[in-house]
């Protein structure tokens, strides 16, 4: 297996190639006593290995670039003064320099090469090859991507996309290359390659390939989504949960009554909903065995913890956020008991759930959306950004992230909206906006109440519930749901003085309006303004 020729990538004098290592090999490699610094993994009391990623404990969006060439120029959603995003242009000359730095770093070394699939649908899956010098990074992609069988590996052939992880190399001349810092994550759609320099954070590999799937799939009529998904045990219908980091995608889709398709990245084609990944990447800050048993129990041998505080004897402190609030674990999806087998895909979705963690305490715990509101709130992608998933953010601040994943969109947001709406119209799916954040009590809505709301959406009882309209937003909200505290369903009731809600609601409504202005450059966008908040 290890007779791979890496010289075609410019990587020379390779000492040894460890090709698609087993979990036992990875464990031995990442815990070698001779390892130092961020390469060294620590075995914890739960059997999982913990690693530290240095100053980058989250993605570094300011350091993300696409090479501007004939493959990308007219199709990528480039950042602009009117609408800033993370897709910054990089020159061919800068790319050549960065690629040279990466292959130089990887040359003359003992390397890990992990050949994976991205996408559970064989017809449209991407063959992705990862090349790195650090064992735990090989472990990370082995967890997160779809692991080929021995037969699939034997017939793998050439990859569709190659990611070079040179975390140890720095971009000293970044200013002359037109970059942001000594760190870079750069994509070349022409050569179908990704280069990672000077960041150890595992999520750059995962989300990097997600950006590529988000480029390819909508162009071939497949909805590409930053969401989790599950299905009923009979496999009759799926539900998808959109939401930014920390809004509850992983927690709420991991449901003992249902089968998990996946927790973060999916496609929806004419056959149904399918996972892009072969693993889960869950936040573990304040992880509690009682409230999230599935995730807790997934943390065992072969799982990989990131930036968690672990004592010398292996004892884990999940409450300690001194390194970062964005502590994580990656594990192969089969560490969760209730999953769709053998392939992570399900039927068409009947329920589409938008999760927002509203720090303002304005949004109802659940709203039933019209088709027009569905498009408006999908393009708005509102949440309050929760602490620490990106560098430099620690307080809850309002965030509008198109399609609940603007950081990963490689095409214009309206393209993702179009594809989602097409699929929803085809299957008659309904959308719901669920607030997993705060209300007038100053406390976060309990996970018990949120789970009750999700149950009512999934079993259809929400569609039978009595409802009323909420002002400014014109949301239709149920006034009673089984197993949910009725006093929270109208957010005004959670305030000592409803005038307080009124004031905050007007403020938030104005923020929605201001944000949506950037979508009104065409007729379709203009037509949706009426579905948004009105003052």
From Swiss-Prot:
This is Phosphoenolpyruvate carboxykinase (ATP). The keyword Lyase applies. Its main location: cytoplasm. InterPro entries: PEP_carboxykinase_ATP (IPR001272), PEP_carboxykinase_C (IPR013035), PEP_carboxykinase_N (IPR008210), PEPCK_ATP_CS (IPR015994). Its cofactor is Mn(2+). Binds 1 Mn(2+) ion per subunit. GO terms for biological process: gluconeogenesis. One of its GO terms (molecular function) is metal ion binding. It catalyses: oxaloacetate + ATP = phosphoenolpyruvate + ADP + CO2. It is found in: Cytoplasm. PANTHER family: PHOSPHOENOLPYRUVATE CARBOXYKINASE (ATP), PHOSPHOENOLPYRUVATE CARBOXYKINASE ATP. Mn(2+) binds at residues 207, 226, 264. Belongs to the phosphoenolpyruvate carboxykinase (ATP) family. Substrate binds at residues 59, 201, 207, 328. GO terms for cellular component: cytosol. Keywords: ATP-binding, Cytoplasm, Decarboxylase, Gluconeogenesis, Lyase, Manganese, Metal-binding, Nucleotide-binding. Its EC number is 4.1.1.49. Pathway: Carbohydrate biosynthesis; gluconeogenesis. Involved in the gluconeogenesis. Catalyzes the conversion of oxaloacetate (OAA) to phosphoenolpyruvate (PEP) through direct phosphoryl transfer between the nucleoside triphosphate and OAA. It is an enzyme of class 4 (lyase). It comes from the Bacteria. It comes from Parabacteroides distasonis (strain ATCC 8503 / DSM 20701 / CIP 104284 / JCM 5825 / NCTC 11152).
